[in-house]
Every structure is written in C-alpha cells, then in structure tokens.
Amino acid sequence: MFLINGLEQDTLPASDRAIQFGDGCFTTACILNGDVCLLEAHIRRLQHGCEKLMIPFTHWDTLRQEMCELGTGKDSGVLKVIISRGSGGRGYSAASCLNPTRILSVSAYPAHYSRWREEGVTLTLSPVRLGRNPMLAGLKHLNRLEQVLIRTHLEQTDA
C-alpha cells in the first residue's frame, strides 16, 4: 500500500520527476511498537535533502502526521518516505515544478535482519565504485543506480 499525497493509491504519473530523473530524496525508518523510531531525525534528513536539492516542500506537519499514522498499530515494520519534486514539463528545468509529491509505504521488517544480528554478515569488495559529488554527499537522493549495480553484482556472484 502506498500513500501518495495523502491518498491510498499505487500509481504515480509518468511525468513525475522521481521517474524522469530520480529527482527527490527519501528516508527509511523502523517501526517498533507502533512508533516510528527516530521520527524527528528522519524529518530532518528529508528537510536537509529538500533544501540541498532545492525542492520546495512545505507540508512537514502533514508528513509527520502521516508517518505516525502509518506506524500506529504495527508491532514492527519499515516505513519508506519519498519526496519527489513532482510533475513537470519536459527537460531538466524544474521551474514549473511547484507541487512536490510525497510517497509513503510500509512493509514488513525483513526477517533476515534477525539472522544477520545473530550470525553476522560476510563482507566483500564490489567492483562498482561510488561516484563522488560533494554537493550530493550524504543525501539519500533517488538516483541509487550505483547501489542497484552493487546489489546485482552480489546476487550474481553469491557474495
């Protein structure tokens, strides 16, 4: 289930810049005993991301309320929150993008995390190197292709 701009739905316009350019930021939070862990830290992460990416998102109180509501009644889970710049015209200019999109989803807490905690993990080196861009350093932006390639390599090599 996705909550997109406050409505339960599972579709996003193809014109949304999250799809077109990976133009947005996200955070992933743990839900425990009905609460979103470190809620304010996740809000600050999103605020920082929007500020650095110059996304004019202003609905912080609404977002905070939605995050809390999605955690209510759940023993455990994972809450992902995405803020995209929203829909806009063709091309890289974001000048016409005045209505950012907020996307929230909840999923089950991964079962393998408990196993990792008990048994540990094995590390390996990836042939995929992360790019360096000081302006984006530390941001959880939507362009995660390097991480996708790293994960694909791990799966293909059984690492």
Annotate each PLM feature.
Residues M1-C68, S84, G89, S93-A159:
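Helix-start/capping segments and mature chain N-termini
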